């Protein structure tokens, strides 16, 4: 394991250098405002939870809907538009979503983002032992707001797919630094699962991040553009989560759109 750790950090250092050179070469022909665009984020970003927003009867109905569509082993990610529509039938969720979105737009307007796209991007994420390639993959979202709605949990333990949230937010991001970060994360995602797992567990032990315990029926709000996060793996059962992303400020030169299409297929 010691040799694996040394190899991991050596590969990470070499990959970072190659990635930075590649990104600079790729972007040398881009001029003007696009590289100088910077988004600044307040220090008070934190995950917020809203308990008992969605009736458990609605959660059960949604899980039956998922079973009917995909069977016992739905693919790791699907468009969650239909599920989001089912949630919006409830007045409490609908009003909460509207309030959170209004607050996010007001925050974005203060930093000069008044023309954010209004279309939400809902994704159904189903994690199991067949989707380990998606586990322990730290990343930042492309969107300023994410609502996380747990639909079904896996058995409790270290392999239950919990969300892992890093404590230190990034507060100032340019298009170039964001693209470089996405490429670096992509290289880390290509590492073996055992290495990615060790890295996550190490960060948990030293306090760089924390596990977020969730429960079906509650709604969780966070700024995934500012807060790095990942998910533990799921070895038994299946964990189902609806993620609704809002307000992509366009700091990825189209890279996020390409990756998004690849995930949803």
Where are these regions (language model features)?
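Soluble, non-transmembrane catalytic domains of enzymes that act on hydrophobic metabolites at membranes
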Residues: 5-9, 16-18, 70-73, 133-138, ...
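Flexible, solvent-exposed coil segments and beta strand-coil junctions
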Residues: 125-127
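Catalytic core of Fe(II)/2-oxoglutarate
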Residues: 174, 178, 185-265
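Catalytic core of non-heme Fe(II) oxygenases with the double-stranded beta-helix
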Residues: 129-216
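A structural signal for short, well-ordered beta-strand segments
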Residues: 122, 147-149, 242-246
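A short coil-to-beta-strand element that immediately follows conserved catalytic motifs
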Residues: 111-123
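N-terminal auxiliary "cap/dimerization" subdomain that precedes the catalytic jelly-roll/cupin core
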Residues: 1-104, 218, 254-265
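Short hydrophobic/aromatic beta-strand or adjacent loop that forms the aromatic wall/cage
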Residues: 45, 144, 239-241
């Amino acid at each position: 394991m010691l040799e694996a750790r040394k190899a991991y950090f050596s590969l990470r250092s070499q990959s970072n250098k190659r990635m930075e050179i590649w990104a600079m070469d790729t972007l040398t022909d881009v001029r003007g405002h696009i590289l100088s665009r910077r988004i600044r984020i307040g220090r008070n970003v934190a995950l917020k939870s809203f308990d008992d927003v969605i009736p458990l009867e609605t959660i059960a109905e949604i899980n039956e809907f998922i079973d009917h569509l995909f069977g016992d082993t739905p693919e790791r990610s699907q468009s969650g538009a239909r599920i989001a529509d089912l949630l919006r039938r409830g007045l409490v969720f609908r009003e909460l979503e509207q309030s959170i979105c209004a607050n996010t737009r007001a925050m974005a307007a203060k930093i000069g983002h008044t023309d954010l796209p209004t279309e939400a991007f809902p994704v159904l994420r189903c994690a199991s032992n067949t989707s380990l390639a998606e586990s322990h993959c730290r990343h930042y979202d492309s969107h300023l707001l994410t609502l996380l709605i747990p639909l079904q949990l896996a058995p409790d333990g270290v392999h239950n797919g919990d969300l892992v949230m890093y404590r230190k937010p990034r507060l100032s991001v340019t298009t170039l630094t964001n693209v470089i970060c996405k490429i670096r994360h992509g290289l880390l995602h290509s590492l073996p699962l055992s290495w990615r797992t060790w890295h996550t567990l190490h960060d948990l032990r030293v306090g760089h991040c924390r596990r977020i315990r969730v429960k079906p029926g509650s709604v969780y709000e966070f700024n995934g553009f500012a807060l790095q996060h990942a998910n533990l793996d799921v070895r038994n059962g299946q964990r189902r989560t609806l993620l609704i992303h809002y307000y992509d400020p366009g700091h990825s030169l189209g890279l996020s759109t390409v990756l998004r299409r690849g995930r949803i297929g």
